[in-house]
Amino acid sequence: MRKVLIVLISVIFMVGCARVPATQAPAKPELVIDTFLQALSRGDVDTCISLLADDVVFRQEPSGIKLEGKAPFEESLRRVTTWHPQYSIVSPIKVNGDKVAFSAKLSEDDFKILGLEYVNADFEIQVWEGKIKSWVTIVNQADWKRLTELTAGGIGVKIEFVEQGMRIKELAGNSPAYEAGIRSGDVITAVNGVSYSQMREGEMQLRIQGPVGTKVKLTVTHEGAPTPVDIEVTRVSLEQLRY
């Protein structure tokens, strides 16, 4: 989950410059970035991909996450658009040759689900001959710590997705889900009253995770049972789970 979240927070903001006409090439770096970000805010991932160099490199700190090439970047962009990102620039946009730098507040639906309105991050982007060649996101240390805390707890299960929700495949030996009465073959159909049918890809796992020691209410259909039941589980540190 954490890696997902790292990609989700790392790829867009709004600059507010004029869009680059398709006939202009190479465009100024700040205009290329603006076109990229406007397209991404509309969910137009294809336009975003067209503005990436074939050997584009994405890096995020302090996690050390690194993506190389268009394919992994495209995958992360398609995930990002499902969370309706909103960005607010909080510093002057600095342009030095082919490099652009700025700071922004990032707000996304996934952050709000976790209970965080936004994170602060610095961006360093290189544009070469009209294509984005490198993208570095440096998340504010305090915000990164908070994100880590908000996703540090879990219920100790391995899962697979089915039409009705999330089926339990395996439970950790010290799983709090097992202690609460959940067994292999059970299906989680809702989290804290939110139905699986209303969720986006990855949202159920996100809602199940949370700070260590907090409680999550799961609606569970036991294998072979006709009706679901609500079960409350206390999250434990993911690091202490043993499979």
Write out the residue ranges for each language-model feature:
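Bacterial N-terminal signal peptides
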Residues: 7-16
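Short, low-complexity N-terminal intrinsically disordered segments enriched in polar/charged residues
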Residues: 17-42, 46, 50
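A short gly/proline-enriched turn/hairpin at secondary-structure junctions
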Residues: 51, 57-68
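Surface-exposed, charged secondary-structure patches
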Residues: 71-116, 124
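Low-complexity, intrinsically disordered terminal/linker segments enriched in charged
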Residues: 133-152
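PDZ/PDZ-like groove recognition
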Residues: 151-177, 181-184
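PDZ-domain C-terminal substructure recognizer with occasional recognition of PDZ-binding tails
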Residues: 164-167, 189, 203-243
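Conserved PDZ fold ligand-binding element
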Residues: 177-200
